[in-house]
Structure formats: structure tokens, C-alpha cells
Amino acid sequence: MELCTQTVAADHEVIITRRSGSHHPTLWGDHFLAYADLRGANEGEEKQNEDLKEEVRKMLVMAPSNSLEKLELINTIQCLGLAYHFQSEIDESLSYMYTHYEEYSIGDLHAIALCFRLLRQQGYYVSCDAFKKFTNDQGNFKEELVKDVEGMLSLYEAAQFRVHGEQILDEALNFTITKLKQILPKLSNSQLAQQITNALKFPIKDGIVRVETRKYISFYQQNQNHNQVLLNFAKLDFNILQTLHKKELSDMTRWWKKMELVNTLPYARDRLVECYFWCLGTYFEPQYSVARKMLTKISFFISIIDDTYDIYGKLDELTLFTQAIERWNIDASEQLPLYMKIIYRDLLDVYDEIEKELANENKSFLVNYSINEMKKVVRGYFQEAKWYYGKKVPKMEQYMKNAISTSAYILLTTTSWLAMGNVATKDVFDWVATEPKLVVASCHIIRLLNDLVSHEEEQKRGNAASAVECYMNEYSVTQEEAHVKIRDIIENYWKDLNEEYFKVDMIIIPRVLLMCIINLTRVAEFIYKDEDAYTFSKNNLKDVISDILVDPII
């Protein structure tokens, strides 16, 4: 455990030895300030983009409704990150497929699996009985299916959208993972091999749209049967959006420099760009530019407050800060030590800015939903601090109940909706505040994924017990056994999430809002796949961010 010394008292100096995270500094610094004057697409690029869009729209409309051609075109458009241009056309096509699903369930493995996955991905619950024809008398998938590599990959992706009680999809997932790994070394098609390798690590269910779009454009270009119009449109659209995202990050960097929080709080992770990346994974579309910047600011504060409770603040200070957050009044800052005053005042200032921005749409009252969730997050962090200072390892049930707050995902969901326009009504904010099962599943997934990859490092520096320690302590198992069990628990929460997604009335809770919840969960799957890539962003995340936010596609 590394220690640091810091002067913290507001009225007189008291030197206190504290824990430190020893986090590496920002990798980006002022880099994105260089894009402040970056121009968007010029007139020629805009016209080319519109022309290509109309060509693709015609392709989509002209493809026969009940054809494999239509299925594959929709899939390609989605994988190339272009679906947001054609949402109404895709919605109409998938609605037709849903009402005529039996017609699609008589094709080959690839066609059935692709249709099944596209419909479930859209929120339509369709039966998995169509896959029974591919099993033998013992209920096992037929070995001959391995000859159909495309079909196997489609079945693998389809099985990811399973819910509780669908044994055939559980079997399909195990079967395809095993067989695809065996097939890989024998494939002569390098493009297909790359695609399978990526899918085994990042299935479509877990994929961040912009990250997977960048990869798929490369895969698609290598495919000899690619459509040049689609490829050209995907490249141009990717670069146009990237320019917008660079400009947003330039704005965020100016905001970050103006606050100077990092210089004041050296113990905290300086991860502005990584916060923005997280929010970009939630929604990338141009109409959510303001929403992304709001969400990034709140995400940045969540990170700082998390570090304050996890490693730096003393229990008496954390008690005062928790009380101040509950009061939510600038006068409450007077009782705080200096470093906490800075956090508190800047946090309230950011919420004031958001409230003023939403006042233009008569939506300022919605900010209270985000503030209430911030209070819950801080209560959760404070509970963990009390466990730590009391040397208590809670039962898993206690820990997971508190994890709904400490995941901060209801706060992020609520904040992500603030600037999404009229689609985000008071009713949807009331709904998420009740902690519905879908949202709780998302919270638990992020909490457990984070704990699996970060608990060893956190225990070295002296953090509160994670889910791993809680499980080991309660059930008297080894760390390895706890990891295996927690992985199973995560899979069950994904089944909960899928199941609830199919049940939600999308007239009341529009799909575009539900996708914020799902996309936040996808970002967690990505960030915590092999390590805590947010904290240790210099290892692998830096290159991904460069691909998405720095380097255009040539």
C-alpha cells in the first residue's frame, strides 16, 4: 500500500497519512484542445454522405421483405454503424419479420439464427424452438453443423440473447464456443478467422457500437463480396461522426482544465477522456451531443467521489461529506475540509449548469432525479467506507443490495436521459427510480465485472471487501472458486436483463431509452473484460480510444 501525506483541514493544518491509488496520470492531457477549430464535413462531403445514404435506403426498401438478402442487409447496416440513419425502415422490416416469423424458421442454420438474433436484439421475444431441427435424438447439436462456419457463428451470436429456462440456447452457446475454437486454426479465410476471434471475445450482445463499427469496417473491406456503396458510406460516416466527437472532447478538455480538480486532488484518477469514451458507448449519434457532455461531466465526478471514499477520505470526513450531499446546499460546504469543499462546490455548479441548460426546454425539474440518484450513490459509498473502517465483510445479499447504488448505473441512466428530448418523459424517470429488475440486473453486472478484475489490486492498497471477498468469506471457498461462481451469477443477470427487455412496454419506455441501459452494460463488459481498463487505461484502452477518437479511417 502506498502512502501519501496531505494537508486537509479547513481551519488549521493537520498532517494525515492516507492511502493512495498510485494511479498513472492522464494519457491525453491537452491533446483534444487541438480540435477546437476543427471543421465538420465540408459541403462536398455532406452531399456525398447524403447521396450514399439515399442509395443504401433504396437498397433496404427494395430488398424483398421475406428474404435472406433483407436479413443480411439489415445486419450489415447495423454492424457498419449506419442503422441510426434508417431506424424507421429497419423497425418496419423487423416488425414484418416478427409477424411472419414462422416463414423465417424453416431456412438453414444461418438464416434462422440471424433472424432470431435480429428480432431479439430489437426487443421481440421469439421462440427458440426453431433450433430443435438442428439437434439429434439425444438433444445435442448435430456434429455436421461444424461444416457451416457462417451458420455456427450466427448461432453463437443468437444464443447470447437467451433467457432463463432456454436450455437449447445454453447448449447452443457451449457447442458453438467449443467448435468455433476448434475450427479457427484450420480456417484459410483470414477475414472470417479474424471475425470469429473477435466475436468469441466481444459478441454482438456485448459490443460497443463505435468500437465494433471500426473493426467491422475492416472485416467488411476484406470480404471479397462487399458492397462498395455500403463500404464507402460507412467510412465517410464514421469520419464525420469522429470529427464531431473530437470537437466535443475539445469542449470537455477546456471544462476540465478550467476546474483544475486534478491538481487539487492528486489521489483521484484523471480520466476525462475515458469518461467520455464510456458516455460515447452509451450513445454516439449526433443528436445526443449535449447529452453526452452532460453525462461525461457527471461521470467524471462519480470517479472523483468514488476515489475519495475508496482510498483517501477519513471516516469523519466522509461522514461530513455524506451529510453535505444529503443537504445539497452550498452552505453545507462550510463544515468540509478544503479538498472536499472543492469537490462539493464544483459538483453543485455542474448541476446548476445542467439545470439552466434544461430550463430552455422546460425540463429543469428532471435534474432532481439525477441529484436523488447521486445521493444514493454517495450513501452506498459511505456504507462501504463504514464496512472498511469497521473491518466488516458483509454477506453477499447485503453487498449486492448496496451494489445497486455503488455501481452508479441508475445515476448514469437517469443522467443520460436528461437531454434526450421529449422521448424522456417524467414517467420514464419515475420508472427507473423504482429500481426495476432490468436496471438492477445492469447494476449488478457492472459491479461484479468491476470486482472480478480489480479486487486484488484494491485489497493490496486497503479497500473495502469486494464481491469476491464477500463470497469467499460467506461460502468458505477459494478465490478461483469464487471467480467461477461470480461469472455464473453475471450470466444469470444477463438472462434477467434480456428477459426484462422483452417484457418492457416500449410505448411507455421507448427502446431508445432502454438502449442507454443496455449500452452502459456493454461498456462495462468491454472495460472490465480482462482488466480494469478505466483505471489502467495505458495498457489497452489507449489504442482503442485512438482508433475511435483520434485516427480517421483512410
From Swiss-Prot:
Needed co-factor(s): Mg(2+); Mn(2+)
InterPro entries hit by this protein: Isoprenoid_synthase_dom_sf, Terpene_cyclase-like_1_C, Terpene_cyclase_plant_C1, Terpene_synth_N, Terpene_synth_N_sf, Terpene_synthase-like, Terpene_synthase_metal-bd, Terpenoid_cyclase/PrenylTrfase
Domain of life of the organism encoding this protein: Eukaryota
Enzyme Commission (EC) number: 4.2.3.73, 4.2.3.47, 4.2.3.106, 4.2.3.-
A Pfam family the protein falls into: Terpene_synth_C
Residues reported to bind Mg(2+) 1: 306, 310
Residues holding Mg(2+) 3: 458
Co-factor: note: Binds 3 Mg(2+) or Mn(2+) ions per subunit.
Keyword entries, A-Z: Lyase, Magnesium, Metal-binding
Enzyme class at the top of the EC tree: lyase
UniProt-recorded Gene Ontology molecular function terms: magnesium ion binding; terpene synthase activity
Binding site for Mg(2+) 2: 306, 310
Pathway(s) served: Secondary metabolite biosynthesis; terpenoid biosynthesis
Cited function: Sesquiterpene synthase involved in the biosynthesis of volatile compounds. Mediates the conversion of (2E,6E)-farnesyl diphosphate (FPP) into gamma-gurjunene, (E)-beta-farnesene and (+)-valencene, and of (2Z,6Z)-farnesyl diphosphate ((ZZ)-FPP) into (E)-alpha-bergamotene and (Z)-gamma-bisabolene as well as beta-bisabolene, (Z)-alpha-bergamotene and (E)-gamma-bisabolene to a lower extent. Can act with a low efficiency as a monoterpene synthase with geranyl diphosphate (GPP) as substrate, thus producing beta-myrcene, (E)-beta-ocimene, limonene, terpinolene, gamma-terpinene and (Z)-beta-ocimene.
Family recorded in the similarity comment: Belongs to the terpene synthase family. Tpsa subfamily.
Annotated protein name in UniProt: Terpene synthase 17
